[in-house]
Regions:
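Low-complexity, Ser/Thr/Pro/Gly-enriched N-terminal "stalk/linker" regions
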Residues: 21, 29-85, 127-140, 240
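Membrane helical hairpin/interfacial module
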Residues: 84-91, 95-156
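C-terminal motif of bacterial Sec signal peptides marking the signal peptidase cleavage site
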Residues: 16-18
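Second-shell loop/turn segments in exported
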Residues: 43, 47-51, 80-84, 101-106, ...
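Extended ligand-binding clefts on enzyme/binding-domain cores
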Residues: 50-51, 131, 135-164, 177-305
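Short glycine/serine- and small hydrophobic-enriched flexible loop segments
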Residues: 94-102, 169-176, 239, 284-289
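Hydrophobic core segments within long, regular secondary-structure runs in both alpha-
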Residues: 53-65, 94, 112-123, 168, ...
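Bacterial N-terminal signal peptides that target proteins for export
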Residues: 1-10
Length: 305
């Protein structure tokens, strides 16, 4: 727990009064005690943004808040049709709620309730190898779930490593953000830890040390592994950091070696290439990669930022 000091507003009033002529005044109620976070860093100031940016931020938050099922916390893959929920969308929604708090668009209590509902759903939903009636297996979840029941949406829906990672990044973000002593915030942290610990990452290493894109109960493991620079960076990071089912460090080493065909040059500047913008954005939503280098990027004289 951080060191905290209590500063009485009454003491400040007395100090000011001592510098002024004494006057007879009627007794006043004692001001409330002010709690000061002594060693907490100052809150960063939100930069001034063009009105368009502010509008995009607000609308993005509102999409997740307004379209998510309040009963189970599931967020649709698309709108307005909302045929099914995406577990990746849920990860982004869990991240959006604190942004709403920080901007004053929802209260902390509202966001806590929504987040706790979501995490309880993923903790309690049926899991197993069966083709129907389940939301996931081995700690991983199906890419698309029925919006109401939260079960696998259809037979073409895979148990997805990267979408589970996107969900889990939101879960772990919630665990970090809700750091108060409120019993509900403590429960958020506990459930988040439980969900992360359940994921059996080595199970998807059918061609170790690389990690497969997923699994179907009908046909088994997907034949393709995560290779080349892309959004799967967070898959390997989560798998390496697992407190219960970690993959070995050579998973990262071998994965980065698959970058070799992904380099390009623009105006004399060498860069790590991946066409779709989301491949560069997704992992960076939650991890600040500035000045971080692994052995591979150090050899190239580059970074991920």
């Amino acid at each position: 727990m951080q060191a905290r000091h209590l500063l009485s507003a009454a003491a400040l009033s007395l100090a000011v009064a001592a510098c002024q002529p004494a006057q007879q005044e009627p007794a006043k109620p004692r001001p409330p005690v002010i709690l000061i976070e002594a060693d907490a860093p100052p809150r960063p100031m939100k930069p001034e943004l063009p009105p368009l940016f502010d509008d995009i931020e607000r609308r993005t938050f509102q999409f997740f808040w307004d379209t998510t099922n309040e009963i189970n916390g599931l967020t649709p893959d698309r709108y307005p049709s909302r045929p099914f929920a995406s577990i990746a969308s849920v990860g982004f929604a869990l991240t959006a709620y604190p942004i709403g708090i920080e901007n004053g668009w929802v209260s902390r209590n509202q966001a806590i309730d929504r987040t706790l509902t979501t995490l309880k759903f993923f903790r309690d939903v049926p899991m197993g190898p069966q083709r129907t009636g389940k939301a996931g297996y081995k700690g991983f979840y199906y890419h698309f779930l029925d919006m109401q029941e939260g079960r696998r949406y259809d037979s073409w829906v895979e148990l997805s490593s990267v979408d589970t990672a996107l969900l889990m990044m939101g879960v772990l973000f919630a665990q970090s953000y809700y750091d108060g002593d409120d019993p509900r915030e403590k429960e958020i942290r506990q459930i988040a830890d439980t969900l992360y610990r359940k994921i059996d990452w080595p199970w998807l290493q059918q061609r170790a040390p690389l990690i497969s894109m997923g699994w179907f109960p009908e046909s088994g493991f997907i034949d393709h592994d995560w290779m080349g620079y892309n959004e799967a960076m967070m898959v390997y990071i989560l798998a390496l950091g697992s407190p219960t089912h970690p993959v070995s460090p050579d998973a990262w080493t071998v994965w980065t070696r698959t970058y070799d065909n992904d380099w390009g040059v623009y105006q004399g500047q060498e860069y790590l290439s991946f066409g779709p913008l989301f491949g560069h954005q997704y992992s960076h939503v939650w991890i600040h990669f500035r000045d971080i280098q692994d052995a591979y990027m150090r050899e190239r004289g580059s970074t991920y930022f």
